[in-house]
């Protein structure tokens, strides 16, 4: 019986050789099937197998592209699981913990990178590198409050909140996002934010992906955030930073190392927490995300998976028929990625998701409260740590209130199936049947440390306008 089983589970010598370079101990059968499928494709190309073995056996040496034909949807199916080919083979031979194509970037030597949309796609794992989180420069907080109260932006912030429409504006991805680089949507005249970097700092850096989004690579990492010139910087061992940004505050006084206290960004244990709501009722406990890839879906997975928040498990005695019906349509929900200091939301549900992210809206030049519709199979960058760092570095020079206002940027609201805003009959997110609130811990903790260093506000913050 054993001999019969081994007869039907025969592995070719070529597959065995390639599996010798496999990384990690998990998913042996899946990896074997993935390699077997690849060998069948490569055997049709002269020298392809040899080139792959050369790349795997000599990681530090130059190697050529190893290509396979691109499928219609760009994905490859291995044992009932579909994935992007370069991600699959990078996972097998280099990074077993790889979660998403957002984590990979092709090397310059690669002639057939996945993102180039050519008929052939390179699967050489040594033609890709893993995206690293950029190091954010510390925020320099003045030790003494030399800021002129007349320059306070508190009035502007209050005007902005007063001028906010009763209902948020709406934008649909990707239709509303194709704006000329030199003409973003106008901000409110009282907007506390500088012009959108989508049009100024790095105009050719798309922050989102089209309907084929799971098969597109993100843009290059944007330039570092603004820092004062070297002779104004606080610690002697600080790294030199780009000072060419056109977003430098014009009224910033000259500061010396004795006058400022640097506050550094620290990556928290849990990068975010997610809270689920039905109408205006919070349901269940908060989900704390430690994995950089998190699924929020409508199913019931009792296994307590740390990278999955199953809304189907949560009960609510006040649930009405509209909520029940909406929950049935959440399906695969949304996939959240935290990669290289950026947060992406990919809609896996058959129904659209609706996102209100002030950071995303700032980048695209939308009004801060705009709600963006993300259709099924699309992904959108909803937060960028480096843009946030730029805003924080500038806000420090405008006082406590300006920094405190940035807390709104660290919370992202997202509804499933049903939208809200000017184009929908629901005016507020609390009128949607099923929605989540995402709190970004890293930026929030950074703000907290900066505010603590700044001391008390010039004008007490209150709920009274």
UniProtKB/Swiss-Prot annotation:
Residues 13-137 form the MH1 domain. The modification Phosphoserine is found at residues 463, 465. Phosphorylated on serine by BMP (bone morphogenetic proteins) type 1 receptor kinase. Ubiquitin-mediated proteolysis by SMAD-specific E3 ubiquitin ligase SMURF1. GO terms for cellular component: cytoplasm; cytosol; mitochondrion; nucleoplasm; nucleus; protein-containing complex; transcription regulator complex. It is found in: Cytoplasm; Nucleus; Mitochondrion. CDD domains: MH1_SMAD_1_5_9, MH2_SMAD_1_5_9. Residues 169-182, 237-251 have a biased composition (Polar residues). Changing residue 80 to A: Exhibits impaired binding affinity to GC-BRE DNA sequence. The modification N-acetylthreonine is found at residue 2. Zn(2+) binds at residues 65, 110, 122, 127. GO terms for molecular function: DEAD/H-box RNA helicase binding; DNA-binding transcription repressor activity, RNA polymerase II-specific; metal ion binding; RNA polymerase II cis-regulatory region sequence-specific DNA binding; RNA polymerase II transcription regulatory region sequence-specific DNA binding; ubiquitin protein ligase binding. Residues 186-197 have a biased composition (Pro residues). Transmembrane segments: none annotated. Disruption phenotype: Disruption of SMAD5 gene leads to the mid-gestation death of mutant embryos largely due to extraembryonic yolk sac defects. SUPFAM superfamilies: SMAD MH1 domain, SMAD/FHA domain. Predominantly expressed in mesenchyme and somites during embryogenesis, and present in many tissues of the adult. The keyword DNA-binding applies. Pfam families: MH1 (PF03165), MH2 (PF03166). One of its GO terms (biological process) is bone development. Residues 271-465 form the MH2 domain. Homodimer. Forms trimers with the co-SMAD SMAD4. Interacts with PEBP2-alpha subunit and SMURF1. Interacts with SUV39H1 and SUV39H2. Interacts (via MH2 domain) with LEMD3. Interacts with WWP1. Interacts with TMEM119. Interacts with ZNF8. Interacts with RANBP3L. Interacts with HK1. Interacts with HGS; this interaction attenuates BMP signaling. Belongs to the dwarfin/SMAD family. Transcriptional regulator that plays a role in various cellular processes including embryonic development, cell differentiation, angiogenesis and tissue homeostasis. Upon BMP ligand binding to their receptors at the cell surface, is phosphorylated by activated type I BMP receptors (BMPRIs) and associates with SMAD4 to form a heteromeric complex which translocates into the nucleus acting as transcription factor. In turn, the hetero-trimeric complex recognizes cis-regulatory elements containing Smad Binding Elements (SBEs) to modulate the outcome of the signaling network. This is Mothers against decapentaplegic homolog 5.
């Amino acid at each position: 019986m054993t001999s019969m089983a081994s007869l039907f589970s025969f592995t070719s010598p070529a597959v065995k050789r390639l599996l010798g370079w496999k990384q990690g101990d998990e998913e042996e059968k899946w990896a074997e099937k993935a390699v077997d499928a690849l060998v069948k494709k490569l055997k049709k190309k002269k020298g392809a197998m040899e080139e792959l073995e050369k790349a795997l056996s000599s990681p530090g040496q130059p190697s050529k592209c190893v290509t396979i034909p691109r499928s219609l949807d760009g994905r490859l199916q291995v044992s009932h699981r579909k994935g992007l080919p370069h991600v699959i083979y990078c996972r097998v031979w280099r990074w077993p913990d790889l979660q998403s194509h957002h984590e990979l970037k092709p090397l310059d030597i690669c002639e057939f990178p996945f993102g180039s949309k050519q008929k052939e796609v390179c699967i050489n794992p040594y033609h890709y590198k893993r995206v690293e989180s950029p190091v954010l420069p510390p925020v320099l907080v003045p030790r003494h409050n030399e800021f002129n109260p007349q320059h306070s932006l508190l009035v502007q912030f209050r005007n902005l909140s007063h001028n906010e429409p009763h209902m948020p504006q709406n934008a649909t991805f990707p239709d509303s996002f194709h704006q000329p680089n030199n003409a973003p949507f106008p901000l409110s005249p009282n907007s506390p934010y500088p012009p959108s970097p989508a049009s100024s700092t790095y105009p050719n850096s798309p922050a989102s992906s089209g309907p084929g989004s799971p098969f597109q690579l993100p843009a290059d990492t944007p330039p570092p955030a603004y820092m004062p010139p070297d002779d104004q910087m606080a610690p002697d061992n600080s790294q030199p930073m780009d000072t060419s940004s056109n977003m430098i505050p014009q009224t910033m006084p000259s500061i010396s190392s004795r006058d400022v206290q640097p506050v550094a960004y620290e990556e928290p244990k849990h990068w975010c927490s997610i809270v689920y709501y039905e109408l205006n009722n919070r349901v269940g406990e908060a989900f704390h995300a430690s994995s950089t890839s998190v699924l929020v879906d409508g199913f019931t997975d009792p296994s307590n998976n740390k990278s999955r928040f199953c809304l189907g498990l949560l009960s609510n005695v006040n649930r009405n028929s509209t909520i029940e019906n909406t929950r049935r349509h959440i399906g695969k929900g949304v996939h959240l990625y935290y990669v290289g200091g950026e947060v992406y939301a990919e809609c896996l549900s058959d129904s659209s998701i609706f996102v209100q992210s002030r950071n995303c809206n700032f980048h695209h030049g939308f009004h801060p409260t705009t709600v963006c519709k993300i259709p099924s199979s699309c992904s959108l960058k909803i937060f960028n740590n480096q843009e946030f760092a730029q805003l924080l570095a500038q806000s420090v020079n405008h006082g406590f209130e300006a920094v405190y206002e940035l807390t709104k940027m660290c919370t992202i609201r997202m509804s499933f199936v049903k939208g809200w805003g000017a184009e929908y009959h629901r005016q507020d997110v609390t009128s949607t049947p099923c929605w989540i609130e995402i709190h970004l811990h890293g930026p929030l903790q950074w703000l907290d440390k900066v505010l603590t260093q700044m001391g008390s506000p010039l004008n007490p913050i209150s709920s009274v306008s």
